[in-house]
C-alpha cells in the first residue's frame, strides 16, 4: 500500500488532509487508527497492489456508509509493505448534496455499526496470526454498544452476541468512544 495526502474541496474553501506516518511494522496501529478516525480509512488516498486483493479474501460491506474503512482496514492488516508518499495527490469534492454522508445521523451510525459488526463476524474465528482486523474487535463491539444506547438502535437484539462480547472487551484509549462512555457501555451490557 502506498498512501498520500489529499485536498478536501468544500464549496468555499479547501483543506489539505495530511496523513500520519505508518509502516507495515506498525500496521496494527494504522488499522486501529483508521477505524477510530485518527488515520484516513479512505481508499481515495491509497494505491493498493491488485495482488493484495487476489492473495487474500477481502470482504465488501453490506451497507454504503464507511465502506472505504471496511475495506482499507482489511487491506492494511494484510499488507506486507506500507509506504507514505509525502505529497498531495488527490482532490476530494465535499459538496455533493446526494452523498451518503448527507444521510441522517442515526442512519449513518446504524450502517456504520452494522457494517463493522458484519466484519467482526467474518473474522472472529480467524486465528490472530492470520487475522487482519482483530486489533479493532474491542473497538467494534464497544462502539456498536454505544451507538445502540445513544441512538436507540437496538443492536443488542439484532446481534445477540454483542452484550457478551462487550463484557469481554477491553476499555482502551484512542477510541472514538470516550472512556467514561466505554465504562457505561460495559455496565449496560452486564444487564443485557
Residue ranges of predicted features:
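Membrane-interface aromatic/basic loop that binds lipid-linked glycans or pyrophosphate carriers
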Residues: 149-192
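Long, charge-rich low-complexity segments
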Residues: 118-131, 183-192
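Structural motif
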Residues: 128-137, 171-178
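Amphipathic alpha-helical repeat scaffolds of TPR domains
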Residues: 135-147
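Catalytic core of nucleotide-sugar-dependent glycosyltransferases
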Residues: 88-96, 102-128, 143, 150-165
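Donor-binding/catalytic cores of nucleotide-activated saccharide
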Residues: 1-83, 92-108
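Generic alpha-helical secondary structure signal
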Residues: 43, 48, 52, 87, ...
Amino acid at each position: 500500500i502506498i498512501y498520500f495526502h489529499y485536498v478536501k474541496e468544500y464549496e468555499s474553501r479547501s483543506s489539505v488532509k495530511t496523513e500520519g506516518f505508518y509502516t507495515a511494522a506498525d500496521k496494527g496501529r494504522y488499522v486501529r487508527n483508521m477505524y477510530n478516525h485518527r488515520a484516513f480509512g479512505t481508499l481515495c488516498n491509497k494505491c493498493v497492489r491488485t495482488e493484495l486483493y487476489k492473495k487474500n479474501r477481502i470482504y465488501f460491506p453490506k451497507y454504503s456508509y464507511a465502506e472505504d474503512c471496511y475495506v482499507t482496514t482489511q487491506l492494511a492488516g494484510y499488507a506486507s509493505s506500507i509506504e507514505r508518499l509525502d505529497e498531495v495527490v488527490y482532490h476530494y469534492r465535499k459538496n455533493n448534496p446526494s452523498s451518503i454522508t448527507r444521510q441522517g445521523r442515526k442512519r449513518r451510525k446504524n450502517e456504520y455499526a452494522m457494517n463493522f459488526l458484519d466484519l467482526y463476524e467474518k473474522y472472529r474465528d480467524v486465528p490472530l496470526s492470520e487475522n487482519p482486523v482483530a486489533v479493532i474487535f474491542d473497538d467494534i463491539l464497544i462502539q456498536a454498544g454505544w451507538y445502540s444506547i445513544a441512538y436507540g438502535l437496538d443492536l443488542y437484539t439484532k446481534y445477540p452476541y454483542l452484550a457478551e462480547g462487550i463484557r469481554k472487551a477491553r476499555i482502551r484509549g484512542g477510541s472514538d468512544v470516550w472512556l467514561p462512555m466505554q465504562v457505561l457501555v460495559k455496565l449496560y451490557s452486564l444487564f443485557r
